[in-house]
């Protein structure tokens, strides 16, 4: 029964039109397209973190092609206090990182994507100021990776459609 189930499942999947996103590995069209995306400098510490994460994710195979696209990113990094305690101190913070980005075709100047991505994280404020600052920085590092991953996903979908 199992011997029949696997080929049957393969036939059913082939009929539904699903195709692997990264077909062809590092030599496939999507991987080559991602490798041809140049990330413009992004302002600030959050910008440095997001840009590095984007560059890592866009050239995962180590292949760097001549730039065909430019990715412009504007960030909004906000840290706000929440949860007032009885002694009027803040007990919790929320760090929000939002990105507005555009993928520009360098040959034509056409904007391929104009979108936003973002994420947020909660931070406990503790009595140690050092621990709180460390938690804020860790949250920024984690959010940078999440936002970069969301941007790369949308860029991948747009390049695949082209």
Each language-model region and where it sits:
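C-terminal/domain-edge helix-coil "capping" segments
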Residues: 131-162
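An acidic helix/loop motif centered on a single conserved Asp/Glu
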Residues: 42-57, 147
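Surface-exposed short loop/turn segments
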Residues: 61-116, 122-138
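Post-signal peptide N-terminal segment of mature Sec-exported envelope proteins
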Residues: 25-45
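Bacterial signal peptide processing site
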Residues: 17-20
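Positively charged n-region of N-terminal signal peptides that target proteins for export
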Residues: 1-4
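C-terminal motif of bacterial Sec signal peptides marking the signal peptidase cleavage site
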Residues: 11-15
């Amino acid at each position: 029964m199992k011997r029949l189930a696997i080929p049957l499942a393969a036939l059913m999947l082939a009929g539904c039109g699903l195709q692997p996103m990264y077909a062809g590995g590092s030599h496939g069209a999507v991987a080559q397209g991602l490798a041809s995306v140049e990330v413009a400098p992004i302002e600030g510490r959050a910008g440095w973190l997001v840009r590095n994460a984007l560059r890592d994710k866009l050239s995962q195979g180590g292949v760097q092609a001549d730039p065909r696209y430019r990715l412009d990113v504007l960030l909004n990094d906000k840290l706000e206090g929440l949860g007032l305690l009885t002694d009027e101190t803040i007990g919790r913070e929320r760090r929000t990182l939002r990105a507005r980005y555009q993928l520009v075709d360098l040959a034509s100047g056409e904007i391929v994507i104009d979108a936003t991505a973002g994420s947020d994280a909660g931070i406990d404020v503790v009595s140690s100021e050092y621990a709180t600052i460390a938690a804020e920085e860790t949250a920024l590092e984690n959010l940078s990776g999440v936002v970069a991953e969301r941007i790369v996903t949308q860029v991948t979908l747009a390049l695949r459609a082209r």
